[in-house]
């Protein structure tokens, strides 16, 4: 495994592999790797000749009052995880390398970037789309692996890839959860033991909603979850919305495949989660 810290060097290495006929898989991360990331790495190692894991805490996707400075950066542990899981290259660029002072180009995926998390984290998805586009170009990846926990992010990246004709194929990967149901996230480390216990009600409520969705109307499903989330001590809901799986538009009575997406504060920690919901065929 090699550590690469320069974008030009990483691109040259990737192009050499492409020339040799190798297929490249990219797992973009901000570090603080957990079992969710490891599942993405495993898929790339299985599918691709070369696996690149990028570790870059991207400043342009954080708002002015967000957690950029305190975001966990366990670099040594992350490197060990990558090595243990057969990663070929860990790409760890500096902020100045990715976004020098004269950087002026940003990517916006209109409409999709402005709803759900985008309504609360202004310019967040502009930062995400821009850094992912750069990583696609630097890595020359044939495939890139993204977890479905960040479902809105996944849809934005899919749309960007389609609209801008990127050669990189987006591979959606299932949410990885702890045994108790909590969706794995690097920000879970912010939670106290009590906060973690309280947060379990999020995934539990969504799981019950998926069952209700099969036969109950949307308003019932949505209100039931909101009421449950409100009862979590110390919680504050940013949003709890049922949207179409394909385009994130609000679901209606004709929707057969939906996603219930939520963002909830537990104390000072903002957690997102979602669940896919499918109507019974006879409903």
UniProtKB/Swiss-Prot annotation:
Superkingdom of the source species: Bacteria
Keywords: ATP-binding, Cytoplasm, Ligase, Nucleotide-binding, Pantothenate biosynthesis
Residue positions of the active site: 37 (proton donor)
Recorded metabolic or biological pathway in which this protein acts: Cofactor biosynthesis; (R)-pantothenate biosynthesis; (R)-pantothenate from (R)-pantoate and beta-alanine: step 1/1
Gene name of the record: panC
MF annotations from Gene Ontology: ATP binding; pantoate-beta-alanine ligase activity
Residues at which beta-alanine binds: 61
UniProt record similarity statement: Belongs to the pantothenate synthetase family.
InterPro entries from the UniProt entry: Pantoate_ligase, Pantoate_ligase_C, Rossmann-like_a/b/a_fold
Protein's UniProt name: Pantothenate synthetase
EC number: 6.3.2.1
Gene Ontology CC annotations of this record: cytosol
Amino acids binding ATP: 30-37, 147-150, 176, 184-187
Binding site residues for (R)-pantoate: 61, 153
Keyword Cell membrane in annotation: no
Swiss-Prot/TrEMBL GO biological process terms: pantothenate biosynthetic process
Principal location: cytoplasm
Note in the entry: The reaction proceeds by a bi uni uni bi ping pong mechanism.
Subunit organization: Homodimer.
Group of enzyme by EC: ligase
Pfam families named in the record: Pantoate_ligase
């Amino acid at each position: 495994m090699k550590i690469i810290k320069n974008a030009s060097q990483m691109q040259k290495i990737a192009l050499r592999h492409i020339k040799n006929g190798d297929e490249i898989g990219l797992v973009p991360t901000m570090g603080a790797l957990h079992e969710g990331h490891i599942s993405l790495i495993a898929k790339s190692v299985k599918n691709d000749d070369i696996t690149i894991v990028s570790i870059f805490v991207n400043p342009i996707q954080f708002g002015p009052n967000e957690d950029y400075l305190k975001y966990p950066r366990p670099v040594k542990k992350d490197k060990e995880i990558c090595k243990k899981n057969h990663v070929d290259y860990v790409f760890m660029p500096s902020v100045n390398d990715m976004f020098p002072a004269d950087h002026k180009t940003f990517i916006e995926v209109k409409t999709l970037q402005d709803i759900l998390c985008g309504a609360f984290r202004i310019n967040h998805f502009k930062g995400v789309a821009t850094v992912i586009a750069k990583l696609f170009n630097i890595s020359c990846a044939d495939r890139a692996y993204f977890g479905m926990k960040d479902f809105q992010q996944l849809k934005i990246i899919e749309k960007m890839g389609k609209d801008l004709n990127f050669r990189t194929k987006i591979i959606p990967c299932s949410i990885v959860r702890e045994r108790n149901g909590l969706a794995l996230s690097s920000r879970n480390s912010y939670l106290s033991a009590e906060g973690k216990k309280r947060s379990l009600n999020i995934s539990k409520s969504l799981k019950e909603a998926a069952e209700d969705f099969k036969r109950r109307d949307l308003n019932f499903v949505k209100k039931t979850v909101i009421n449950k989330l409100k009862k979590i001590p110390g919680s504050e809901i940013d949003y709890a919305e049922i949207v179409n799986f394909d385009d994130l538009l609000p679901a209606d009575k004709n929707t057969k495949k939906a996603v219930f997406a939520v963002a909830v504060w537990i104390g000072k920690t903002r957690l997102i989660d979602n669940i896919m919901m499918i109507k019974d065929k006879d409903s």
